[in-house]
């Protein structure tokens, strides 16, 4: 495998609205991010994945773009963006842009022209039909919206203010490639591609994901934009299998560097149930099965794994699969050790490195997320109690990830001098960056150590993965390179568990426990986790 910079990189996702506010308006901004680059450099990350900062009416927090080549005024100016890129480069931190090209805002100039002038070439940039079919929006209800002016319906797989683009239109595709080159020329390090598996859709057959033209479009995009550039490109692909992931990320196919697959995230939900029916506990044997499949089937010559627990759409992992009560610190470290020593590129979501938790939402008035609000109204109409709905939002709602970053124990957690757009988690007095940096045993320093290991040890990139037989609640695996093996053992429970057989430990590489005592007793205390080099 030809080594690329992203093979031993660690990416840090910033959700700009919630990261750091520099001007007191309660909304995070680009200058705020730039002001915290020294902190991210201390953590050791290679690149920032920046959620959208483009011009937008903010119907879906920036994933509804009205101008791809301008910056939303709430985040700052193009000069602020250029400063962030330049200051990142000084610290060897690349900026990866969020590319949202399945849809635009209904306030984009293309859609305004398409709507007002049905004979315009821009009309065909979107998907119009005389009658709707059965496609359902990801945000509830029909994905078709009637436009009275023209008497036709347009497709929106998300909000009605996010009309889907028609990728069959060649002129549209080349506008998108020109826009990507605009950002590449500004010195960015790559693109995270939002719901990219939807661009090949065939609406008349109700095929939304993985349509037949998806991969030809991505090959064309590759050739027109990043082919000869050393850029990281990662696609969001909810329905991917290892075979599908290889189509995207096999270097011979000349498409993307890697994809986000969500099979493990599916364990957060009850089998066969919609998203809001969350699973009461983690099915650890199933988690082992899923990770092992992806680690072994996505071979290094044919593809590459993205490793993540959190993003801006998902609840906090320490609350979902950790124990954010008695074992918050230890379980957060355990989950980090489990993930970061696998094969692939790890992604950290802001606040994960200090163990930020889900928010204790009490009423619907506390909620900002359009998906959660739409679901709540739909569920209330069906007779679901508000108590049940609020419990679901506390466990699954996207706002859990979007509460402001907790910098210190001062007012509003040091995020803003004003009133934050979304309430700060009340636990910020205990859980904040300042406290983490002052405590040598904090979660932060475990993440810092894991990132340093990835830079120091080539085997983390290249070694094979082997699942090790262990108790149901214990996830153990080896990374094997030639004669040398490294063992990772993690107790994914708040109960004592049996230690799997360990022969000949030469060195402890990282742990959240006293490994010698564990080896002597043969017992794993709750959330024990370690990696050792075997003799």
Stretches with model-predicted labels:
Residues 2-177, 181, 185, 196-251, ...:
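Acidic/aromatic-lined carbohydrate-recognition and catalytic surfaces
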Residues 5-6, 225, 232, 239, ...:
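Loop/helix patches that line or flank the sugar-binding groove of alpha-linked glycan CAZymes
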Residues 56-57, 103-105, 198-203, 240-245, ...:
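Flexible loop/turn segments at secondary-structure boundaries
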Residues 189, 292-313:
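Aromatic-lined glycan-binding groove of carbohydrate-active enzymes
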Residues 202-203, 304-325:
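Active-site clefts of carbohydrate-active enzymes
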Residues 496-514:
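Beta-strand-rich binding/interaction modules
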Residues 519-535:
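C-terminal beta-strand-rich structural cap/linker in extracellular carbohydrate-active enzymes
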């Amino acid at each position: 495998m030809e080594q690329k910079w992203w093979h031993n990189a660690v990416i840090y996702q910033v959700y700009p609205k919630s990261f750091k506010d520099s001007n007191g308006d309660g909304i995070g901004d680009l200058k705020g991010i730039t002001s915290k680059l020294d902190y991210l450099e201390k953590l050791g990350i290679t690149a920032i994945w920046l959620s959208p900062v483009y011009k937008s009416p903010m119907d879906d927090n920036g994933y509804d773009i009205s101008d791809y080549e301008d910056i939303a005024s709430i985040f700052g100016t193009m000069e602020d963006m250029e400063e962030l890129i330049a200051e990142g480069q000084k610290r060897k931190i690349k900026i990866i842009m969020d590319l949202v090209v399945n849809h635009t805002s209904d306030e984009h100039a293309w859609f305004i022209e398409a709507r007002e002038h049905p004979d315009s070439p821009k009309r065909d940039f979107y998907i119009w039909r005389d009658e709707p079919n059965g496609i359902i929006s990801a945000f509830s209800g029909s994905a078709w919206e009637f436009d009275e002016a023209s008497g036709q319906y347009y497709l929106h797989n998300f909000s009605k203010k996010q009309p889907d683009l028609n990728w069959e239109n060649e002129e549209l595709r080349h506008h998108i490639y020109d826009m990507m080159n605009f950002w590449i020329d500004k010195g960015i390090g790559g693109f995270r591609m939002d719901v990219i598996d939807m661009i090949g859709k065939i609406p008349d057959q109700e095929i939304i994901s993985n349509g037949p033209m998806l991969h030809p479009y991505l090959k064309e995009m590759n050739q027109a934009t990043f082919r000869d550039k050393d850029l990281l490109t990662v696609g969001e692909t909810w329905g991917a299998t290892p075979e599908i992931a290889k189509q995207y990320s096999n270097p011979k196919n000349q498409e993307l560097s890697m994809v986000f697959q969500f099979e493990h995230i599916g364990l957060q939900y009850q089998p066969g149930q919609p998203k809001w029916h969350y699973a009461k506990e983690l099915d650890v044997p199933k988690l082992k099965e899923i990770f092992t499949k992806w680690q072994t089937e996505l071979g290094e010559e044919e593809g590459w794994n993205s490793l993540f627990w959190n993003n801006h759409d998902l609840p906090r992992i320490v609350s979902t699969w950790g124990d954010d009560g008695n074992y918050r610190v230890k379980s957060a470290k355990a989950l980090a050790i489990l993930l970061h020593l696998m094969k692939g590129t790890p992604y950290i979501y802001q606040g994960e490195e200090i163990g930020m938790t889900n928010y204790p939402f009490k009423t619907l008035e506390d909620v900002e997320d359009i998906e959660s609000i739409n679901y709540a109204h739909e569920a209330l109409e069906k007779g679901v109690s508000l108590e049940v709905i609020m419990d679901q939002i506390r466990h699954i709602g996207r706002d859990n990830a979007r509460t402001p970053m907790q910098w210190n124990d001062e007012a509003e957690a040091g995020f803003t001098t004003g009133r934050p757009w979304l309430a700060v988690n009340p636990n910020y007095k205990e859980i904040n960056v300042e406290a983490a940096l002052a405590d040598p045993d904090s979660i932060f320093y475990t993440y810092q150590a894991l990132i340093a290991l990835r830079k120091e040890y080539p085997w983390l990139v290249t070694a094979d993965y082997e699942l090790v037989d262990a108790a149901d609640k214990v996830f153990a695996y080896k990374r094997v390179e030639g004669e040398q093996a490294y063992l990772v053992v993690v107790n994914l429970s708040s109960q004592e568990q049996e230690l799997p057989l360990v022969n000949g430990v030469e060195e402890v590489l990282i742990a959240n426990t006293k490994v010698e005592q564990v080896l002597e007793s043969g017992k794993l205390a709750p959330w024990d986790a370690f990696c050792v080099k075997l003799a």
